Amino acid sequence: MRGILEAAIYVPRWRLETANISETWGQSTAKGIDEKAVPAADEDTLTMAIEAVERLFSNSTADRNDVDHVAVATTTPPLAESDLVAKLRTATGLPANVRTATLTQHTASGAEALATAIDRDGLSLVVCSDCPVGIPATTDHPLGAGAAAMLIGEDARTAVSSVGWYSLDAPGIRFRTADSVQSLGITNYERETIITAVTAAMENTTTDRSIDYAVLHQPNGTLPYRIARSVSIDTEKLTHGIVSRTIGDVGTATVAIGLLKALSEATTGEDTLAVFYGGGTAAAFNCTGSLNVSGLLDFDETESLTYATYLRQRGYLGTEQITGGGANVSLPTWQRSLDSRYRLVAGRCPLCDSISFPPDGACQTCHERVSFEHVPAEREGTIVAASVIGHGGAPPEFTTYQQRSGRYAAVIVELPVGDQSVRVPAQLTDIDTDEVAIEIGDTVRSTIRRIYEQEGVVRYGVKFTPNMKNRQTD
């Protein structure tokens, strides 16, 4: 039976406590949420999706070259019109001829992506990634960030035995006209509409109330309990799948992350119900089995933000737009070097067997112009040089990032390539340079982040994150 073969999650390490929101605004709309996950200044739905996918394959026996279908669900793509999946495919090294689908518009789009993968043949990759934004004084309070990646195929450890759907027109319940989530806030109407749709979707599956775990639509930490009581599900069965309490409302990814967390607690033969809702559509999935899920440590390895830092990091405070660029690279040149910028692909010289990075032009050892054999560098390396860039010290295209993140570190990282190595210049991310000392010899790991935006085009590429042992304060 088809189902989930492998899975991984990614949740940004930064957290904002609801108490800080209440202290600032005198109240909070984040009901039942203790804290929420906050994307770094250089993160968005694409970078989080990439990280979840890389975690999946780094702990999987599956070959990414066998994937023939990729579906990504989000309510907040980086651009209103662009192919998010094409960027994901390139960055993660999936086959160029893979069939792609981007699903958006509402928070149940993750259910559409999962159902499509279940219904088809072959090996499918489903990714739910979101970081919704709202009005800071009201609708933003519960909104978090995160991503889930699932590999779908035959003979799965977690079988999806039944899927049920229900839809109705639900005007005024969570909509977005431009850049931020809105709702008319008619609480009883919203709650009753959601419960009606969720109940009907459950009735359209073979699920009964004797399930072992339930993961229900959770835009906050209280609604899933109301839904459970209304459909006679023991609220104890929600325990492992309630993630909104600690990462917030993650749009289309909330239930997906909650489902994977619940499946990691389940044992063989146990049943887990997952119910998505969004825009008037509800979908219920009956899953049987357990799953090893990569990335669950993200729930524990966290760092707190002040509310002022949160507003700056999310871009809610005004940032200055700078023209020009001291480190500008033309788009054609950037495109030609994507394999190196995304996947750290180096080149082996056929004449002297030495490694060059990037694999372009003349060999950096024998200086002959050759056609390099492409070989990937390791994702983990060592800092051999570092410098902290303060305000006013960055090239113009990094000004907006620096305004949101504060001081940042530029490093040179030595990465193994077989029995040789290459040195790569890059930025460090997910580190407060005012609190954490950067030392030569520290180990770091590559990740994909936003590098800068120019003329409306976001340039993505490799940055490095420190290992946890390097996050010690002086």
Predicted ranges, named:
Residues 439, 447-474:
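OB-fold/S1-family single-stranded nucleic acid-binding modules
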Residues 323-382:
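Cys/His-rich short segments
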Residues 1-43, 140-192, 267, 277, ...:
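Condensing-enzyme catalytic core mediating Claisen C-C bond formation in acyl metabolism
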Residues 45-61, 191-207, 258, 262:
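Short, well-ordered amphipathic alpha-helical segments that serve as non-catalytic structural scaffolds
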Residues 380-432:
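Glycine-rich active-site loops that engage anionic ligands at enzyme catalytic sites
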Residues 77, 97, 102-122, 140, ...:
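Claisen-condensing/thiolase-fold acyl-transfer catalytic domains that form or cleave C-C bonds
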Residues 45-105, 208-230:
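Conserved beta-ketoacyl condensing-enzyme motif
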